[in-house]
Amino acid sequence: MGVIQAIDRLMTNPIPDGQVDDILRPQGESPLLQKGYVTTSVDALLNWARTGSMWPMTFGLACCAVEMMHAGAARLDLDRYGIVFRPSPRQSDVMIVAGTLVNKMAPALRKVYDQMPDPKWVISMGSCANGGGYYHYSYSVVRGCDRIVPVDVYVPGCPPTAEALVYGILQLQKKIWRTKTIAG
């Protein structure tokens, strides 16, 4: 037998005699898929990647934005959690709404939220963003940004401390870790 025939024999896939006993078993029933092992592993991998690389887009409307900037400074350093502030909604997956949301700003908030790619999350920071705050009874104030966009985490306070925002971000990471994207 020549060299070419030997290489050709090695490179050709063998023909199976019967049903292939593969891990997924396309012809038969798969015990792994029935119990959800494969999809939960993929969910865990995706959620691990999402919690380690959250990119928030800041939507600072009032004094709470100063505390949000303080959270990104050297003392608390959000970079060690994998959090990098992004200026564009198309590059971010978390929106932090900080401050008083007025009626004229509500359509802009919704437009920015709609421009974010899925999956996306929202953190409402401060009493004004949570429920109107001090200006709750004003005719021009939206009584909570949850009337405009779905909110995942509420950070209370007027203004909330930077540590409270970091705690809210950690709570959002726990929430992301518990979500089931594929096996759901």
Swiss-Prot record:
Signal peptide: none annotated. Gene3D superfamilies: 3.40.50.12280. It catalyses: a quinone + NADH + 5 H(+)(in) = a quinol + NAD(+) + 4 H(+)(out). Pfam families: Oxidored_q6 (PF01058). [4Fe-4S] cluster binds at residues 63-64, 128, 158. Keywords: 4Fe-4S, Cell inner membrane, Cell membrane, Iron, Iron-sulfur, Membrane, Metal-binding, NAD, Quinone, Translocase, Transport, Ubiquinone. It is a peripheral membrane protein. Binds 1 [4Fe-4S] cluster. GO terms for biological process: aerobic respiration; electron transport coupled proton transport. Its cofactor is [4Fe-4S] cluster. GO terms for cellular component: plasma membrane; respiratory chain complex I. It is an enzyme of class 7 (translocase). GO terms for molecular function: 4 iron, 4 sulfur cluster binding; iron ion binding; NADH dehydrogenase (ubiquinone) activity; NADH:ubiquinone reductase (non-electrogenic) activity; quinone binding. NCBIfam families: nuoB_fam, PRK06411.1. NDH-1 shuttles electrons from NADH, via FMN and iron-sulfur (Fe-S) centers, to quinones in the respiratory chain. The immediate electron acceptor for the enzyme in this species is believed to be ubiquinone. Couples the redox reaction to proton translocation (for every two electrons transferred, four hydrogen ions are translocated across the cytoplasmic membrane), and thus conserves the redox energy in a proton gradient. This is NADH-quinone oxidoreductase subunit B. It comes from Xylella fastidiosa (strain Temecula1 / ATCC 700964).
